[in-house]
Amino acid sequence: MIDFLGGWKRTSYCGELRGGHIGQEVTLMGWVSKRRDHGGLIFVDLRDRDGISQIVFDPERCAEAHAKAESVRNEYVLAIKGTVAARPEGTVNPKMKTGEIEVLVTECKLLNPSKALPFTLDGFVDVNENIRLKYRYLDLRTGTLQQNLILRSKVAQLTRSYLSDNGFIELETPFLTKSTPEGARDFLVPSRINKGEFYALPQSPQLFKQILMVSGFDRYFQIVRCFRDEDLRADRQPEFTQIDCEMSFIDREDIITVMEGLMARIFTEAKGVKVELPIERMTYQEAIRRFGVDNPDLRFGLELVELSDIVKNSGFKVFADVVNGGGIVKGMNVKGAGAMSRKEIDDLTEFAKIYGAKGLAYVKMTAEGWQSPIAKFFTPEEIATMDKAFDAKEGDLLLFVADKPKVVNDSLGKLRNHLAAKMGLTDPNVFRFVWITDFPLLEWDEEAKRWAAVHHPFTAPMDEDLQYVESDPGRCRAKAYDLVLNGNEIGGGSIRIHQEEVQSLMFKMLGLSEENARSKFGFLLDALEYGTPPHGGIAFGLDRLMMLITGSDSIRDVIAFPKTQKGACLMSDAPSGVDALQLRELGIRLAAK
């Protein structure tokens, strides 16, 4: 028989009780995590979001409560009253926060039973993720996921407190906006009132936060949901959360200083990790030169070494021809990996090919010198020069790629991360931040045969590069900056264009006609003509940040109700079909599948 609360009030959470509570009368409420019948006495681990208390049903203390305990099973919901007591000698559990006490039950209410579970919640058995997502309400009862989400809440509170203390105003921007598909696809929402017209869910609040600066709010922030209809990965979701900020009358240094303080506050108070300020900085060009990528993981070495000048006149035509044809040759020294087998090197070669490399040359450093199929093509002087460049020692493994600069950097940059993971060089307890600055403003899109914005069309060029936007676009650097943590971009921002004529020029460079630019962004262009202050901002990906703080493998482990890699919610069965009446009201007719 199911009981009602009947006016009972919880006095403590299950994880709160300690030795200092011994002798107190308490009321606990929660779920049965485990039940053990010891021939008369029944022991139940009662769990809530705060932890577990062991409660004891003794028929001599309360026969009615003991009778109820005989019928309970895992995940039944109970409310109990009892007395906190010290555990008997020899039964103290130092692994539990409440391990020195137990609660002797005097009354019990069975608030709800539970069906047999589709999987256990103890974490000892691997469960298919789709099953976990289907029964997300059960999965969320597990300690790890609950603690992840509680910590996420703390980070959000710290963010609001810090930004408010620094003069930021929390403002909301619309979710139903105009579609301006320049990057990922928009999620579209049909308008019932204006048939044939659509809203778009925002990919970011970019334009609205800039307009708030035009409006004179000076400093804005928002912890906001954003939406992108794109193919998903372990660290991507169709809906995601940003810590979004914008500031007026500032330059890059002002933004970086304030946001470094935010990261230091979050990591100190939420993670117990001190962030050394100021955070290291590196230009985009330096990052590409040293690490092959613009989001380098600085927890380990494996830096890239360019060898083009050394090999351009060598007898190894593969390298020489690439360099003389406008390409480059780079390599890396994998310290202590000289014993790697040929199969392992072949596997690395196949990995590099994923990113465009045609092959991977290698050298094993032995007591006799180079052991490699390519050794015979180089003079002793060339070998000595490369050894010095690599700081090569006996037992090392040298890896080389020769190709166009983009292919070389992409393949070796990704290979560097792959090797670090394979060799255990990425300590999860180390957090290395770096600001990447001075990005290119524009990049040539070979497929579309036009220039594209590296960040977004509202990023301002460096003052000294503005003169080259039309004449030499590839030369222009952006007032953009990314914050990278352990090889993950966790935030990106820029100083914005605040002059209408410069913004119109940028749209022109991106291949937008004046009419098209006005159609998509006319409200921004109009606003820029009414006294817009210099302004800039940044957005941090809260989901990815929490994934790194908690050491999770996927952002799905730090989001309460995530989607699958097919964009589905298995629990609620979204997306789903809608009935014909709804479609008729919207003026929509579905094409045949």
UniProtKB/Swiss-Prot annotation:
Stored PROSITE patterns: AA_TRNA_LIGASE_II
Cellular component terms (Gene Ontology): cytoplasm
Q: Which CDD domains match?
A: AspRS_core, EcAspRS_like_N
**Region (Aspartate) residue spans:** 206-209
Cell compartments where the protein resides: Cytoplasm
- Main subcellular localization, coarse class? cytoplasm
Q: What residues does the record give for site: Important for tRNA non-discrimination? A: H38, G90
Q: Which Pfam families match?
A: GAD, tRNA-synt_2, tRNA_anti-codon
One GO term in the molecular function aspect is: ATP binding
Keywords on record: Aminoacyl-tRNA synthetase, ATP-binding, Cytoplasm, Ligase, Nucleotide-binding, Protein biosynthesis
Entry's InterPro entries?
A: Aa-tRNA-synt_II, aa-tRNA-synth_II, aa-tRNA-synth_II/BPL/LPL, Asp-tRNA-ligase_1, Asp-tRNA-ligase_1_N, Asp/Asn-tRNA-synth_IIb, AspRS_core, GAD-like_sf
Q: What is its EC number?
A: 6.1.1.23
Subunit info here reads: Homodimer.
Protein purpose: Aspartyl-tRNA synthetase with relaxed tRNA specificity since it is able to aspartylate not only its cognate tRNA(Asp) but also tRNA(Asn). Reaction proceeds in two steps: L-aspartate is first activated by ATP to form Asp-AMP and then transferred to the acceptor end of tRNA(Asp/Asn).
Q: So what family is this one in?
A: Belongs to the class-II aminoacyl-tRNA synthetase family. Type 1 subfamily.
HAMAP family registered for this protein in UniProt: Asp_tRNA_synth_type1
| Matches recorded under PANTHER family | ASPARTATE--TRNA LIGASE, MITOCHONDRIAL, ASPARTYL/LYSYL-TRNA SYNTHETASE
Please state what the protein is called.
Answer: Aspartate--tRNA(Asp/Asn) ligase
